[in-house]
Amino acid sequence: MGNNYEINIVHLYPDLLNLYGDRGNIACMEKRLKWRGIDAKVHMCTNQDGSIDLKAADIIFVGGGSDREQEIVCSLLIEKKEELKAYVENGGVLVAVCGGYQLLGKYYKTANTKIEGLGILDIYTDAGDTRLISNVVLECEKFDQPIVGFENHAGRTYIGENHTPLGKVKFGNGNTGDSGYEGVIYKNVIATYLHGPLLPKNPQLCDLSLIHISEPTRHSLIS
């Protein structure tokens, strides 16, 4: 039986951004909350119903998609840009994977076009000549266990000095293929190229996100 509080998870545009079963990340959050007696309600923000109530959001998830789909989603979210940025700056929890990771930055530049990002993170992405495809193992100082996943991206993402990489690449390519690092942690944002899905493969990363949501959740996750 659940407690008398409920966690609201907002899934941004799963109809457009859902590569490699990214929906599994939502299922993982729901399950790990349920195991601790915490109810979760998932709000799907889709291309058909794009209403977003960020004031009610405890956690936001955005998955991966093609360049074309990223461009569509960015155009749909642009009017919410400042609200999303305020959500992040005020400690809102956000998990972004692959295309969602790129979308949070300043821009994604391909050979033919430049897709303006939401500018929420101090990152930018340039397309490379080849795709970076590999299983990935990361060393993260926050955890005893490595972070694992699968990457498949043409973008090379460069992060600003005020952002911390998610982890050090022990196997695979990472953000640029040669930086030695993968992903970004900024405030309560986790952004990464890793599929898997990410959170079922790395429950410690899921709990790191959930623990920042609210005081009741924090106590349940720690206990």
Functional labels for PLM-detected ranges:
Residues 1-70, 218:
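Extended, subdomain-level signal for the structured scaffold at the beginning of enzyme domains
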Residues 13-16, 124, 196-197:
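Residue-level signal for short, function-critical loop segments
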Residues 37-41, 70-75, 127, 169-172:
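Short, flexible loop segments at the rims of nucleotide/cofactor-binding pockets, characterized by
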Residues 59-63, 95, 193:
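Structural motif
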Residues 67-140, 144:
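Cysteine-nucleophile active-site neighborhood
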Residues 137-187:
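Catalytic beta-strand/loop cores that center a nucleophilic Ser/Cys/Thr
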Residues 211-223:
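Single conserved hydrophobic/aromatic residue that forms the stacking wall/gate
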